[in-house]
Amino acid sequence: MVKHHDVIGRYVTIEVDDCEYKVFYLQNGKGTPLICQHTAGCHNHQWRDLLEDEEIIKNYNVIAYDLPRHGKSDPPLNKEWWKEEYKLTAEHYCNFIVKLCQALDLDNPIFMGSSFGGNVALQLALRHPNKFKAVIPVEAADYAPGFYLDWWRHPHANAAQVCASGTWDLMAPQSPDKDRWLTWHYYTQGSEAFKGDLYFYSVDHDLRNELKNIDGHKCPVVMLTGTYDYLTPPEATENTARQIKGGVYIEMTDIGHFPMSENHEVFRVYLMEALKIIKERTNK
């Protein structure tokens, strides 16, 4: 059987904080830009099913990129990056996303990210509310300490196996085996970046005293978290949303920490609800 797909992949070179990045992204659909960030230590194939969801791509231009050092996006081309430890900061992370959106000429995009991508969605709503139509933080919270650990890159551990194995019990047991194993497989490939990603996730990201400064009326914030996620439990997300002016929280049953990758058919139901809320709030 031969089947050609409509999803296209391209590269764009951008400069962010004096770093030159050649960034890979996948794109499909027409309409409102919906730009998607993968989880820590992973890449854009987590969004594989969203990119081919016929109902979504009729109305949304879905773009899923690889963060530098992940997937097909290399570390900075103009730096001796191997001579220093990778530690992703909130400022650089946000600057990268804004520059990428500008380079792709995205007009008032919706940003959606999961886990450490969900946390940066909150950062964007705080720092750049006028640059986004809305944000959808998935599996996110104001603070997530305790995961910046040395053994993610310890010489006595097989980092690829350790990082991948950590995903297994974060997924709902009833999610399809094929998708659970693909989620595991993706995580065998990104162990070198995983610890540096978690510097942002557990150290530099702390919005406990800043949530009051996020205006969900100016930039709608619709937060989604799965019931099987113990890394960012539903109550942590709900507590975060409650402190944001106009913040919305939706609990996703029967799904875990990697919803778009472990079970798109369940995830899409809640995503459609989130997109409906955003449309109602931004089309007034």
Cite the ranges covered by each PLM segment:
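Active-site loop/oxyanion-hole signature of alpha/beta-hydrolase fold enzymes
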Residues: 18, 64-112, 269
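Conserved alpha/beta-hydrolase catalytic His-Asp/Glu region
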Residues: 146-147, 151-152, 159-216
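Flexible "cap/lid" loop of the alpha/beta hydrolase fold
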Residues: 119-163
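Acidic catalytic loop of the alpha/beta-hydrolase fold
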Residues: 227-232
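Short beta-strand/loop motif that positions the catalytic acidic residue
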Residues: 217, 223-225
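Alpha/beta-hydrolase fold catalytic core
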Residues: 1-35, 57-60, 106-107, 272-284
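Catalytic active-site module of serine/aspartate enzymes centered on a nucleophile-bearing elbow/loop
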Residues: 247-284
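Conserved HGGG/HGGXW glycine-rich cap/lid loop of the alpha/beta-hydrolase fold
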Residues: 21-79
